[in-house]
Amino acid sequence: IAFALAMAAFAAVGLSGRYPLVVVVKEMFTGLDSFPLLAVPFFILAAEIMSTGAISRMLLRFASQFVGHLRGGLGYANVLTGTLFAGISGSALASAAGPGAMMARMMERSGYSKAYAGALTISVAVIDPIIPPSITMIIYALQDRNTSVGSLFMAGILPGILIAALLAAVNWWISRKRNYRSLEPRPPVGQMVRNSFAALPALLLIVLIG
């Protein structure tokens, strides 16, 4: 699509004869000459590295110790892990392919229906473009010079948390209706402290990147 649009624009300018082609090239580079735009490829790279590394497992272990003992605990862990990962990646695809895919497989093995596991995982991934850092918000801010990237980031925090809370409420209702069990008993306090320290690098990334 991008190449088709570019070729159509070049053809229109060339046939009209009103502007030299060098103006089109200059405008293309001017549109990309933006410091905030540099964050987009690095966010994508960070999300890909984190989705294939140990950070997803750290966040999963950290989230499960708080909600895994509840009825439908894997669903809650899916929501909480995805929300935490949203503060790192900013990419819905990275969330669905990384911690989302891991959680969906665990839910299926634990007796959750494949349809529900997939639906919940995809719904949680939608939070990523809302909670900062958000690639979508950066691109939107570049189109309007009166819009601040920081203001958009601040505006996305509360809606993202509300969506996560609503997904947790849906999981509560479906888990009671379908009698989904808890993931595991609540771990001892010492184990929770060790898990929290192990997840500290991932949690610090949320603060640094956000």
Indicate where each model-derived feature is located.
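Alpha-helical transmembrane segments of multi-pass membrane transport proteins
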Residues: 1-210
